Structures are given as C-alpha cells and as structure tokens.
Amino acid sequence: MRILVQRVTSARVIVGGDVVGAIEPETQGLLALVGVTHDDDHMKARRLAEKLWSLRILDDEKSASDIGAPILVVSQFTLYGNTTKGRRPTWNAAAPGPVAEPLVSDFAAALESLGATVQTGVFGADMQVELVNDGPVTVLLEL
C-alpha cells in the first residue's frame, strides 16, 4: 500500500461536476492519494492510517492529530504504475477494484476511528482533484 501525502491549504474532488469531498480554503490539511497492491491487507491499511494521523508534516512540526487537520482520501491506482519498459505504463502491480476498494475504505475508516475528519473521493470514478499544495510538502508512505 502506498499513500502519497500532500500538505494542502485547500483541496477538493469533483465527480460529474459535483464536489464530493473537500478541505476548505485556508484550512491546513492533508490530501492522501491511496494506491493498493495485491498483497495489501486490513492491517496495513490500519498501520498506514496511524502513521499518517501522527506524521509531523504540518506547520510547527505538528501532526494532523495535534491540530485536528482534515484529511481528504482519494483512491489512486496509478501509484503502482510501472514505467521501466517502453513508453506506456503498466498497472499489473495495482490491485483490482474488488480488492482495492475495501482497503481504501478501511484506511479512511481507520483514520476516522483515530479521530480524523475524513472526506473521500469516489472509488473508480473519473475524478478531478484540485489542490493548493502548502510548502510544497509531499511525502510517500509505504508498507
């Protein structure tokens, strides 16, 4: 499981012209792009949620748990794209939807159980993600 985390001052996910999840402007939060591979499980999702919730990448070396920063979770199978051969990525390392969707949901639910305010994109949908990266700070978490 890979989580590409971006510190943001605002972000939103749009599906079919509708905003389905957002971090309001001028609110420091985290955008978590979540990729799932074949051997991931519920424990990895939980451990990564705990790691993200306590990761000190916000202002003044604070974590989301320290300041109650909102987290926007968006599924992102392309995090497992392989570009070593040719000019077209392959997605073989990405878990199929029936495997990945419940694990992305478990990740978001684990964050909520830790006390996070979580919004999400729509799994498998064509999404437009808008964000204002703060810093910029971008970190890759992986287990």
Swiss-Prot record:
Reactions mediated catalytically: glycyl-tRNA(Ala) + H2O = tRNA(Ala) + glycine + H(+); a D-aminoacyl-tRNA + H2O = a tRNA + a D-alpha-amino acid + H(+)
Predominant location: cytoplasm
Its biological purpose: An aminoacyl-tRNA editing enzyme that deacylates mischarged D-aminoacyl-tRNAs. Also deacylates mischarged glycyl-tRNA(Ala), protecting cells against glycine mischarging by AlaRS. Acts via tRNA-based rather than protein-based catalysis; rejects L-amino acids rather than detecting D-amino acids in the active site. By recycling D-aminoacyl-tRNA to D-amino acids and free tRNA molecules, this enzyme counteracts the toxicity associated with the formation of D-aminoacyl-tRNA entities in vivo and helps enforce protein L-homochirality.
Annotated gene: dtd
Enzyme class: hydrolase
Positions occupied by motif Gly-cisPro motif, important for rejection of L-amino acids: 135-136
Protein's cellular compartments: Cytoplasm
Family (UniProt): Belongs to the DTD family.
UniProt-recorded name of the protein: D-aminoacyl-tRNA deacylase
